Amino acid sequence: RTLQFMQNYLFFQEVTIDDIYTVRQMLEPELAAGAVPHLTEADFEALEHSISCCDPTQSHEDLLTQRREDVNFHDILAAANPNPFQRFSCELINEMIRQLIVFGNRTPQTEHRRFGEANAQFHRDIVQAARARDAERVRVLMHQHMQDAASSVKRMKGRIQGRLILDADTLRRPRPVAGRKRA
């Protein structure tokens, strides 16, 4: 029901990429740091799989699939965070990114590749810090990642296309991982 209220509200708002990334830069570092003590080995495996799928040096997927997998990395972290409101807020933003942000056809493939490589490296560094249970390092790395992502999306002339239309089943969950147990 809350999702439907958000949908109704946001449908009539002019939401920009700057709006999305301003909020994302505040929430994602805290979400990731809060997830650190709760990450299981299955979560780490899912995070590493996500990295291999979104890294253009390792993946044979098309660029759109790689970008969606990049966002899935953040959903995996969200699923491990015990704060339901923070988790919901970040998942909503991630779904907006999946559905609404598009790039112009004039953006060179090399730019997309560079963006993907940078994201994959940030993700590897975040996983390494999370494995060391260094929540503060994860927070710092995620903050840097969000700043880099925001500037990359602007540089690549990303724009909002359409309006957010969600229903109760729209928020995508990360792929289920066998043996997932809450810490």
Cite the ranges covered by each PLM segment.
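Short linear motifs at protein or domain termini
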Residues: 1-27, 33, 37, 161-163, ...
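General structural signal for secondary-structure boundaries
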Residues: 13-16, 59, 111
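Short helix-coil transition/hinge motifs at the ends and kinks of transmembrane helices
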Residues: 106-114
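C-terminal effector-binding regulatory domain of bacterial HTH transcription factors
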Residues: 135-183
